[in-house]
């Protein structure tokens, strides 16, 4: 809330009208997202719009279609608690037990801060998208940078989600049809399942135009994610001796040299900055204050879930920990197969949210190349453009996922490059460009430190991941 006070003087009347439309009850409606129960009691402060005004009626109807605070939380939590959560034991393996704890606390604070910075930057710049804000302060080069960053993050995420579908759903179906003896039927093979599930479930969901339409699916996805975490926590210690890890070095208890690889994996799990503007503008009666509260709750819950999954998984598997912790369990374990089914369902609903972002990025890039006319943050793709772009993105990402299964390395590279740029470098840098004249050197220092932190993760983690990939030390992740 202190950030709001700092920037309030910079906001003009038009921006407050656009971004904090609500804070008064509309006639005939109840704002179930109000900050307290006293809203509406002071009639002197209530502005009653003219219901005969067509424009006012249109605004009211459009506002009613948007997500409540609860549904916005589900969308944000689902964006955070996505594929990255099952790689958390791998993150602890790379960071060490103490290093992992410090990583969760530090990244939790930083991600929470930069998420709120994005919305504050939107308000200050009077824009509706993350890329629009960056373009406002950095010009066309800035817009292209954030478009490529957002696009590559979402693109890599979509590939990862398809990989996870191949890691989870086949195990469940093979257990149901008793196909775990090595002779796997054609229809139960990994790549066949990826193609079938993506084509007939993820693809239709990806055709949705509005992110609000995914709110109910996001609610079910968040519930399924909680089931997954609890299943790993409870079932892991009950595994037979041969499936568990038994080797712990002294460095595993403290902080390891590969901690930057861990920061990349955790960053991928927590970063959802490319979705932020969409979720903010999908909120009913939106305001920066409400988004601040939403962000605090979502980040706290997400960090707790990630840490619980990370430490419980690493405690069981230790040196045997894989990039996807579910692949460390037997394929015939009934409880884990239920968790795999839940996780596969979670990917089916998270995948369309990434496609939503990716489609917007492609639309903007095509517009910059003059291949699409009149496309900006206030317009939508035509029906034909929507179908062609969505179909291309879904099946290209699906096709790439058929060629690899090293989830840990994929998320490390995405986290080290695009997530660092999108979450740790651009939000504070954009804010500095918008407000630097009104800040003292001490006030600017945290922004500079965050930017340096982002570059450190990008350079060190990427280098370590590429070296390991070249040496082939992560090949065991593909043995499922």
From Swiss-Prot:
GO CC, alphabetical: endoplasmic reticulum; membrane; vacuolar membrane
GO biological process terms, semicolon-separated: amino acid transmembrane transport
Disordered: annotated segments: 21-48
Principal subcellular localisation of the protein: membrane
Bias (Polar residues): 37-46
One Pfam assignment: Aa_trans
Listed name of the protein: Vacuolar amino acid transporter 2
Organism: Saccharomyces cerevisiae (strain ATCC 204508 / S288c) (Baker's yeast)
Taxonomy of the source species: Eukaryota, Fungi, Dikarya, Ascomycota, Saccharomycotina
């Amino acid at each position: 809330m202190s950030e709001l006070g700092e920037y309030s003087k910079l906001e003009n009347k038009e921006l407050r009208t656009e971004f904090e439309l609500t804070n008064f009850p509309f006639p005939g409606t109840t704002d179930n997202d109000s900050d307290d129960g006293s809203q509406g009691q002071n009639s002197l402060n209530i502005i009653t719009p003219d219901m005969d005004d067509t424009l006012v009626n249109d605004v009211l109807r459009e506002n009613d279609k948007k997500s409540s605070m609860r549904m916005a939380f589900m969308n944000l939590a689902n964006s955070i608690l996505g594929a990255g959560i099952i790689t958390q034991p791998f993150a602890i393996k790379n960071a060490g037990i103490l290093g992992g704890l410090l990583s969760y606390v530090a990244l939790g604070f930083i991600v929470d801060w930069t998420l709120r910075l994005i919305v504050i930057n939107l308000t200050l710049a009077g824009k509706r998208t993350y890329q629009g804000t960056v373009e406002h302060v950095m010009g066309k080069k800035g817009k292209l940078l954030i478009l490529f960053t957002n696009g590559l993050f979402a693109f890599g995420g979509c590939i990862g989600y398809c990989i996870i579908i191949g890691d989870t759903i086949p195990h469940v179906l093979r257990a149901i049809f008793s196909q775990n003896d090595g002779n796997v039927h054609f229809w139960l093979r990994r790549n066949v399942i990826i193609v079938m599930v993506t084509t007939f479930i993820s693809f239709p969901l990806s055709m949705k135009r509005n992110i609000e339409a995914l709110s109910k699916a996001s609610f079910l996805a968040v519930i399924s994610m909680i089931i997954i975490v609890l299943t790993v926590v409870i079932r892991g210690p009950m595994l037979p001796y041969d499936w568990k890890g038994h080797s712990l070095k002294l460095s595993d208890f403290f902080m390891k040299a590969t901690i930057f690889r861990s920061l990349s994996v955790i960053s991928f799990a927590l970063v959802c900055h490319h979705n932020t503007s969409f979720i903010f503008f999908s909120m009913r009666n939106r305001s920066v204050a409400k988004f601040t509260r939403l962000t605090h709750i979502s980040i706290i819950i997400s960090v707790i879930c990630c840490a619980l999954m990370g430490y419980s998984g690493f405690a069981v598997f230790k040196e045997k920990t894989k990039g996807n912790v579910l692949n460390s369990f037997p394929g015939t374990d009934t409880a884990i197969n239920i968790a795999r089914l839940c996780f596969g369902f979670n990917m089916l609903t998270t995948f369309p949210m990434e496609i939503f972002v990716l489609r917007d990025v492609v639309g903007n890039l095509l517009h910059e190349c003059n291949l699409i006319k009149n496309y900006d943050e206030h317009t939508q793709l035509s029906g034909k453009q929507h179908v062609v772009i969505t179909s291309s993105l879904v099946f290209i990402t699906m096709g790439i996922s058929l060629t690899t299964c090293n989830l840990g390395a994929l998320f490390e590279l995405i986290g080290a490059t695009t997530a660092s740029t999108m979450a740790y470098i651009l939000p504070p840098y954009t804010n500095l460009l918008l407000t630097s004249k009104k800040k003292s050197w001490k006030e600017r220092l945290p922004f500079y430190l965050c930017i340096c932190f982002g570059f450190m993760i990008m350079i060190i983690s990427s280098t370590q991941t590429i070296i390991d990939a070249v040496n082939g030390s992560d090949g065991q992740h593909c043995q499922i």
